[in-house]
Amino acid sequence: MSRDDVQRWKDKYLENIEQQERLQRRWDARIDLLRRGLVRSSLAAEGSDKAVDQCMKELREILRRDDMDAGLSGLIPRLEKAVLDSEQRRQQRTQQNIDALGELAQQLLALDLPRELRKPLKQFARDIEERARQSREIPILLSELSRLQRQALAERKGGDAEDGRPSLLQRLFGGKESETAAEPSASVPSVVAASNTPIQPAAAAPSLPVAEHDEAPGGPPQPLPASRVAAIESAPAGWVGVAERGEPNQILLDEPREIWLDSLPLPAGLSFSETLEDAGAESPPAVPADVESAPEAPATPVDNLDGQAVDEAYELPPPIPEPGYSAVAPHIEASLLRLLDGLSLPSSHQPQAEALRERIDGSLNWYELVPVLDDLAVLVLSLADSGQRDFEEYLRQLNERLESFLGHLGDAHAGYTDVLDNARGFDQSLREQVSGLQASVQQATDLNSLKLAVDSRLNGLLASMDEHQREQAEHEQEVSGRLQALMERVNSMEQDAKAFHSHLEDQRQKALTDPLTGLPNRAALSERLEQEVARRHRDGGDLLLAVLDIDHFKRINDDFGHLAGDKVLKIIAGELRKRLRQADFIARFGGEEFVVLLPATSLEAGRQLLERLRAAIAACPFHFKGEPLSITCSAGITAFEGNEAGEVVFERADQALYRAKRAGRDRLEVA
């Protein structure tokens, strides 16, 4: 074997080895993507069934091991059974929801209601069976039922006031509640003044009367009727009606609850604080600390200065004591409304969003906050589901267009085949005419017969050529039309692909950006760190990693409030970003911690840059009500060495940061 053959086989062997390594890396990457996808899918599937949750937990544990085959072979059959059982239970729950909604609708239909109200109730009852099969329709059904029930209550309330007929409560729950409600009771001021502790349910009764609306939303408080007080006092231990706030009453089941005095409507001119002073008692101890632990005071705006000659950009908001719910309710309502307005909901969810907006706007109380958040979470999940469906619809349309594209290509190929067939037919016709002409010449006996034969053959040739040209023109016109339609379809697909790519890029940038500071977040840091490490392994050069942490940031939050802390983070992020080079990278790692990547920078140059950053932060003229406030930061910096992984270098820089913290803060440590 010659030297060239040896070298050729050697190169071929090395090339195959390199190809095998590339395939192995690609396979490992696919396995890793599959693992990550399964882990995230298992997390997304949790919460619906305990058995499925347990299988999902075991699946994640198996995926963390290198040997997955044995674990998966034992887990998959159990997972399939758990999923089937969960689906059966889901169907049972769906049927229970349908039965419950149907029973509520029939109870309302049993009342003496006007025709304009009975018609939508009947339509609602007919639609329950079909709509309740879809879980996303349940909140909409409940909202519609709540609206219809509110209209029925208002109608019955007006009718009872006019003719004295039995009330809705008496007709729904029987005579015992009516007898209980008819007993005399003390007025609300005496009830409130009697005790500052939660009202505990007293003697048991067969059922709890559902309180009607005695006041319009947003109207002044009215005296609590004696029947209302008697109904509350006689409620069974497992039932408590939620105090009315201008929305349909809700009944909480399955566990004893307490009614706080501040959740009941009081007479005009009587405040809850005055009643507590009359009773000589303290605030109820069981009320959450963030509700009643401090006097209600309006929050001072972040940029509201007191006229001092200071830089407004660095003015910190005053400390806000832990407010009562009524003080923070406007802020919560505004935040929820902004979040609701920012959701791009499909038209099918717009009625639900409008109903939720009405519940939030001006009538939200502490007891309704949790169900409102639950409904808002349902909307957000539906938006995510809608985005998934939009993506599926886009893929479906893309598939249809690709099928059409392939159809056009098939038609073009068929047209090309027809052209070849026409050309072969024309060639055959010419050959036949020429052969006939030759035979006629050979067989001719005189000049006249030869002339007639030649004319006949020439006419045949001309006819064949005319037919061929006609077919060719028709085919060219058809092909031109197909090509034009194909070009238009391709242009449309390109535009759709560009728009979708732009949308994906926008979503990706949002996912990689910290919403508070506008800096890249932790996910963006991981991506950039991987790129910089790969570049360094490929091209060489220096690469530094630094970790910065704001000193005593928790004290800033505790002393001046979280709004002040947020403003400090935004200002410091801006100061750091504008002092870095374009090739440098900074990200908010979490809390008050920032990470900086410095490519192509020596350790000494990086140390000097970090010192300048520290000095710039210390020089920021933060102030609070005109008083200067000094804020500093500590940092740790280190350089990549050899083929170190990013996690190892980050851990070393983090340890240097904590050495700076232990050494007194406001300093830089080099590792």
Curated annotation (Swiss-Prot):
The record marks K554 as: Transition state stabilizer. Binds 1 Mg(2+) ion per monomer. Its EC number is 2.7.7.65. The active site is at E592. One of its GO terms (biological process) is cell adhesion involved in single-species biofilm formation. Residues 204-226, 277-297 are annotated as: Disordered. SMART domains: GGDEF. It is an enzyme of class 2 (transferase). GO terms for molecular function: diguanylate cyclase activity; GTP binding; metal ion binding. One of its GO terms (cellular component) is plasma membrane. Pfam families: DGCcoil, GGDEF. The keyword Metal-binding applies. It is found in: Cell inner membrane. The keyword Magnesium applies. Its cofactor is Mg(2+). Pathway: Purine metabolism; 3',5'-cyclic di-GMP biosynthesis. Keywords: Cell inner membrane, Cell membrane, GTP-binding, Magnesium, Membrane, Metal-binding, Nucleotide-binding, Transferase. Substrate binds at N557, H562, D566. It catalyses: 2 GTP = 3',3'-c-di-GMP + 2 diphosphate. Mg(2+) binds at D549, E592. NCBIfam families: GGDEF. Catalyzes the synthesis of cyclic-di-GMP (c-di-GMP) via the condensation of 2 GTP molecules. Cyclic-di-GMP is a second messenger which controls cell surface-associated traits in bacteria. Localizes at the cell poles through interaction with FimV where it increases the local pools of c-di-GMP. This is Diguanylate cyclase DgcP. It comes from Pseudomonas aeruginosa (strain UCBPP-PA14).
